[in-house]
Amino acid sequence: MLIKKRPSWAMAEADATSEHIYLNRREWLRAAGFAGLGLTTALTGVGGFAAAAVAAIEGYPAPRNMAYRLDRDITPEDDATTYTNFYEFGSSKNIWKRAQKLVTDPWMVTIDGLVETEMQLDAENLITKAGGLEERLYRHRCVEAWAMAVPWSGVPLANLVKLAKPKPEAKYLQMETFLDPSIAPGQKQSWYPWPYVEGLTLAEATNELAFLATGIYGKPMPAQNGAPIRLVTPWKYGFKSVKSITRFTFTDKQPVSFWEQLNGNEYGFWANVNPDVPHPRWSQKTERLLGSGKNVRTQLYNGYGEQVAGLYDGMFPNDDRKLFH
């Protein structure tokens, strides 16, 4: 995709120093030619040389889409991959070790509902059919008022929509994660409405920013970050970006999402970022950056308003606050 006008999130001059360091590692991996070494080391832990080598064999790092840049440093990898929400494995942030129980190969994905032909295929085949991998730099804003900036690898969600060939009456895309209490202790907690479900309008799903991520930091997605395939919607609060997706259902009814079922007054369907609409229990005016701990002012739509604000024009003329929780 070629964008002549510099997007609102792009830096005016050069990229952040940490991004240069990251790019140097990417180029070194390419030059080293790991793909011919026949390494079979499993991906373990949260980083390291062995993981990077295996990633190179599996097609990572993906080519960078330079239309998507950052206005801040990339978050250190260890912070982004060890401070995570994944309620299937517990409510603490330090669940990355527990999440390694998730088996992501093989991983079957179903596309059903209001489509021309329902299909079931493995995640790798799905991504292949949806187009080649690319890498994008996105900001990520959690509803809990922390944030990170990371390089995601994956494909535009619009490509999956095109592949699915939804019927004219389809208005929404519902996404569902795995259900396996034998490995995910959080799913044994019956007061949660498992499995985790999220949804978008088709207009949102086909927006240029909506992304299906399969990797991060130039490597396949770690389990704790939502392997093998997750949603990334950078203009929305992070709970909208459902992890470890097993089903895409096209429907004419607005999905009732996981957190909306639990407390729709605090975690609604739209969940767009807005610093001037507080959470009922805390302010959203600022965000704490993982890694540096620095507090910065939150931006409307997380800084992506130029690309997405038009999706919501006139939707709630009497109370647009519904769009921001």
Descriptions of predicted regions:
Residues 1-27, 36, 41-43, 51:
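N-terminal secretory signal peptides
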